[in-house]
């Protein structure tokens, strides 16, 4: 049963992951994000009551 011999497919698996891990991260990390995240205030805002016309 050839699928039990790990020599051919294990080497292909390892080399393909090495290629993915050396090529993809620099491409992804090379992007420049145009929107800088802003910190939101931690104080809780008080909700404004609505003036509903109850008919």
From Swiss-Prot:
Residues 36-55 are annotated as: Disordered. One of its GO terms (molecular function) is proton transmembrane transporter activity. One of its GO terms (cellular component) is mitochondrial membrane. The keyword Transcription does not apply. It is a single-pass membrane protein. The chain crosses the membrane at residues 4-24. InterPro entries: ATP8_metazoa, ATPase_protein_8. It comes from the Eukaryota. It is found in: Mitochondrion membrane. The keyword Protein transport does not apply. Keywords: ATP synthesis, CF(0), Hydrogen ion transport, Ion transport, Membrane, Mitochondrion, Transmembrane, Transmembrane helix, Transport. It holds the Pfam family ATP-synt_8. Coiled coil: none annotated. One of its GO terms (biological process) is proton motive force-driven ATP synthesis. Component of the ATP synthase complex composed at least of ATP5F1A/subunit alpha, ATP5F1B/subunit beta, ATP5MC1/subunit c (homooctomer), MT-ATP6/subunit a, MT-ATP8/subunit 8, ATP5ME/subunit e, ATP5MF/subunit f, ATP5MG/subunit g, ATP5MK/subunit k, ATP5MJ/subunit j, ATP5F1C/subunit gamma, ATP5F1D/subunit delta, ATP5F1E/subunit epsilon, ATP5PF/subunit F6, ATP5PB/subunit b, ATP5PD/subunit d, ATP5PO/subunit OSCP. Belongs to the ATPase protein 8 family. Subunit 8, of the mitochondrial membrane ATP synthase complex (F(1)F(0) ATP synthase or Complex V) that produces ATP from ADP in the presence of a proton gradient across the membrane which is generated by electron transport complexes of the respiratory chain. ATP synthase complex consist of a soluble F(1) head domain - the catalytic core - and a membrane F(1) domain - the membrane proton channel. These two domains are linked by a central stalk rotating inside the F(1) region and a stationary peripheral stalk. This is ATP synthase F(0) complex subunit 8. It comes from Salvelinus alpinus (Arctic char).
């Amino acid at each position: 049963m050839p699928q039990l011999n790990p020599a051919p497919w294990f080497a292909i698996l390892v080399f393909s992951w090495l290629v993915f891990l050396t090529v993809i991260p620099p491409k992804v990390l090379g992007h420049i994000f145009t929107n800088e995240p802003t910190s939101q205030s931690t104080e809780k805002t008080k909700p404004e009551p609505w003036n509903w016309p109850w008919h």
